């Protein structure tokens, strides 16, 4: 199982309850609108460490123009809400002690302000999983596969090489969540 800067931070890490999370996602959805394709692309360019034609095509593919000519997400609010609800119903912290395969967590180093929280969450995942590896990708934000594609690919390749002869029968499972 390979996690690209996701799936390890829990609701309690950000002190969020379901109502708060739903309110935040609704506010995000309403605010994530743009008056033109140009203003949307400028916004997106500021978010990434590197920009390319491929990244631009991906950015354009996730948006659409509504009847009022606003640039909005193709993903519906109900989809975002369902994802948030699922994280509260089935938190990943409950799942990791049941995972019977190696886990590689590649996590971002930017923004630096969130690194302490990410460190705590990563250590918790390592304790819960039977075979987990945590690696930080330097100078990369949440979209680390875009910010540092070669570094991410090399780390995944090396990790797969080490785990290619994985022996499921000898895996020792521990549950540190209780």
Task: Please provide the spans of the model-predicted regions.
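Conserved loop-alpha-helix segment in the C-terminal half of the alpha/beta-hydrolase fold
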Residues: 98-140
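Alpha-helical elements of Rossmann-like donor-binding domains used by nucleotide-donor carbohydrate transfer enzymes
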Residues: 39, 43, 120, 124, ...
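Active-site loop signature of alpha/beta-hydrolase-fold enzymes
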Residues: 9, 113, 143
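Short aromatic-enriched loop/helix-cap "lid" or pocket-rim segments at secondary-structure transitions
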Residues: 12-18, 117-119, 148
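Alpha/beta-hydrolase
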Residues: 35-112
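A general structural signal marking secondary-structure boundaries and capping sites
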Residues: 10, 29, 48-51, 163-167
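Catalytic active-site module of serine/aspartate enzymes centered on a nucleophile-bearing elbow/loop
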Residues: 129-178
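Flexible "cap/lid" loop of the alpha/beta hydrolase fold
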Residues: 1-37
